């Protein structure tokens, strides 16, 4: 199997973007393509048809490649959960909790074996693997235990592209410094450099590019302009880079930025609505009176609920509800809307319980079993009979303590979602719910009607179709601005 790899001089250099765009580009050229990231540390996860967890970014890359996401594309997923620990997921299944030091001792060999086995399976079905690195390949203190960057590139003899973010400054120093810190056999794999996120006239870079090529003896494949093309990101640092307020927005929705926020990709479809402003709010900020508030998922629900209470945000949310505000909780957010969360076995952390917001009649117990599965259901609210697809990822069971004044959101399963009779408090376990176009628009119309705004059409496509357009635009950007002949030559 032939291989390409994207590594970056820093985090957020554009590796995920470039990997997804390359997957779509080669898919359009008729290749059977698969993405691959040996080890990913992220709280944005996706659940495959088989019930396995993988990084959401690799799922997007799989769709870019025109194939179905599978756990072999991301055999190791580390999900940080506070106190310097992470949950370890290998081949889609949680196998333990570890610190960074213990991970190298206890999981390194198992992880490398999982990577090799996954690549063997993928090589039997695909012509080309497009790999993504993590962080920087030149972290001297981490290289001996790096399962994601040049170890994989050497194993596959991958044509490797080094991508650098010029928008943050210091791009030439980042490139030269990274190359200087690579071993000779690693540096020999670097077949091209991509300068990413450039604002301005490209000719201003010409002299610098000439110098860089002369000094490194590696071609600069091109300069990608700073683009407003939006692709799901891997971690919450990227929330700082979200697009500015939209001039035509009529609704304002707040997402509470929990300390351990997870699966905030749930809100990408809302960000894609031209009439909706989505703002991520820190716990110390003033809530105000938005049209809706969303409490997202969390990897450590009990700790984040305690933070919600201690910061005063819980009081703000309860006051907002008393004023008639709409609150929607997803997964951990649903659990926080209840009366109590119990973690007596300390599966999430040292805290054994936390009082909820008491806005839904639920009690949640954190359990040993982790539920990961895809779901297809029909809605009861905000309109009956709408098809809804999504997936569950939670380590807790919620029980209704009263049904009076509350309804089930979905026809098939009362435990999947709940809403009060006034349709002001919503909660569900379904990640990806806003990906469903008709359901999303119908829920937004509920908010619009409360503002006296006209309803928008609900017969719209699901978010996956909008994502397809985005992926094609990303591939078009590569075709317009990059010369990939040095990469093709290696293949």
From Swiss-Prot:
GO MF term list: ABC-type vitamin B12 transporter activity; catalytic activity
Domain GATase cobBQ-type: 250-439
SUPFAM superfamilies named among the record's database cross-references: Class I glutamine amidotransferase-like (SSF52317), P-loop containing nucleoside triphosphate hydrolases (SSF52540)
Keyword Endoplasmic reticulum: no
Positions of the catalytic residues: 331, 431
Similarity remark: Belongs to the CobB/CobQ family. CobQ subfamily.
Protein name: Cobyric acid synthase
Organism: Microcystis aeruginosa (strain NIES-843 / IAM M-2473)
């Amino acid at each position: 199997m032939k291989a390409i790899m994207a590594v970056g001089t820093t985090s957020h250099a554009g590796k995920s973007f470039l990997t997804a765009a390359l997957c779509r580009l080669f898919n359009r050229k008729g290749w059977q393509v698969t993405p691959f990231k040996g080890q990913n540390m992220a709280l944005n996860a996706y659940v495959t048809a088989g019930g396995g967890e993988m990084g959401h970014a690799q799922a997007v890359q799989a769709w870019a490649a025109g194939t179905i996401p599978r756990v072999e594309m991301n055999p190791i997923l580390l999900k940080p959960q506070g106190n310097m620990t992470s949950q370890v997921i290998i081949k889609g299944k949680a196998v333990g909790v570890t610190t960074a030091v213990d991970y190298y001792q206890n999981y390194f060999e198992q992880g490398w074996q999982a990577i090799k086995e996954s690549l063997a399976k993928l090589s039997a079905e695909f012509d080309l693997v497009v790999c993504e690195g993590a962080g920087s390949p030149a972290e001297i203190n981490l290289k001996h235990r790096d399962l994601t960057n040049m170890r994989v590139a050497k194993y596959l003899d991958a044509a490797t592209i080094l991508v650098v973010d010029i928008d943050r400054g210091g791009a030439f120093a980042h490139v030269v410094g990274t190359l200087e810190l690579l071993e000779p056999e690693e540096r020999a794999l670097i077949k091209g450099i991509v300068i990413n996120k450039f604002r301005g006239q490209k000719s201003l870079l010409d002299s610098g590019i000439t110098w860089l090529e002369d000094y490194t003896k590696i071609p600069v494949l091109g300069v990608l302009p700073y683009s407003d093309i939006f692709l799901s990101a891997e971690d919450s640092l990227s929330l700082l880079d979200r697009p500015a307020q939209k001039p035509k927005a009529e609704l304002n929705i707040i997402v509470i930025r929990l300390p351990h926020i997870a699966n905030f990709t749930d809100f990408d479809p809302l960000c894609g609505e031209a009439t909706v402003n989505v703002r991520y709010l820190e716990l110390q900020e003033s809530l105000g009176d938005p049209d809706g508030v969303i409490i997202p998922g969390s990897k450590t629900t009990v700790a984040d609920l305690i933070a919600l209470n201690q910061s005063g945000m819980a009081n703000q949310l309860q006051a907002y509800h008393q004023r008639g505000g709409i609150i929607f909780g997803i997964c951990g957010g649903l659990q926080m809307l209840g009366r109590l969360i119990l973690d007596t076995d300390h599966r999430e952390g040292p805290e054994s319980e936390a009082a909820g917001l008491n806005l839904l009649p639920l009690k949640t117990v954190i359990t040993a079993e982790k539920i990961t599965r895809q779901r297809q259901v029909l809605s009861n609210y905000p309109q009956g009979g709408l098809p809804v697809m999504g997936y569950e990822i939670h380590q807790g069971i919620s029980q209704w303590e009263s049904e009076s004044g509350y309804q089930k959101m979905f026809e098939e399963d009362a435990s999947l979602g709940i809403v009060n009779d006034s349709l002001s408090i919503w909660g569900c376990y379904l990640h990806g719910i806003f990906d469903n176009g008709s359901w999303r628009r119908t829920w937004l119309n509920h908010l619009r009607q409360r503002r006296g705004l006209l309803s928008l059409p609900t017969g719209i496509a699901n978010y996956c179709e909008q994502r397809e357009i985005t992926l094609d635009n990303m591939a078009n950007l590569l075709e317009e601005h990059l010369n990939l002949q040095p990469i093709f030559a290696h293949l």
